[in-house]
């Protein structure tokens, strides 16, 4: 299991290795690499299993589902499925939100069935926000708050 250097990644790799050993009887070799080496290994496909993460750049299913298209540079699993690619292309060309949602649902069903990836956890950030601070974007997928959007109300 290849992972990049960070204490949180090491903990996750150890937890996965222990779980796979207990539940599957699998012997897992952990490989820790510094960021540049890790990126080289990831890009060249020199791994059997890799710990990776992704954060959406924008609030749309394509920000995640597009990663597994055959031609996407972020497709570390080297997943290739013509039906999946066709659904992504149709969704990209559709202007109808309901149709796009249906197409993305179908694409996601293919990912779930073929399992080229195994989502394990999701990063979270806790916030304590005073009730008189308004404009904080609670559902922002980038987890970014711009001061120009924030304002105070009388309390």
Report each predicted region and the residues it spans:
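A local structural motif
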Residues: 18-33, 90
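Detector for C-terminal structural segments
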Residues: 5-19, 38-155
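Short, well-ordered beta-strand elements
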Residues: 1-5, 28-31, 48
């Amino acid at each position: 299991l290849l992972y990049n250097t960070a204490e949180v990644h090491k903990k996750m790799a150890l937890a996965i290795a222990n779980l796979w050993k207990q539940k599957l009887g699998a012997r897992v070799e952990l490989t820790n690499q510094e960021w540049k080496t890790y990126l080289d290994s990831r890009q060249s496909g020199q791994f059997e299993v890799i710990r990776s993460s992704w954060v959406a750049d924008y609030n749309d299913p394509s920000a995640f589902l597009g990663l597994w298209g055959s031609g996407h540079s972020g497709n570390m699993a080297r997943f290739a499925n013509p039906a999946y690619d066709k659904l992504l292309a149709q969704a990209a060309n559709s202007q109808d939100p309901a149709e796009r949602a249906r197409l993305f649902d179908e694409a996601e069903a293919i990912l779930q069935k073929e399992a080229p990836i195994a989502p394990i956890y999701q990063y979270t950030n806790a916030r304590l926000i005073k009730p008189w601070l308004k404009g904080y974007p609670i559902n922002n997928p980038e987890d970014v708050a711009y001061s120009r959007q924030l304002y105070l109300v009388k309390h």
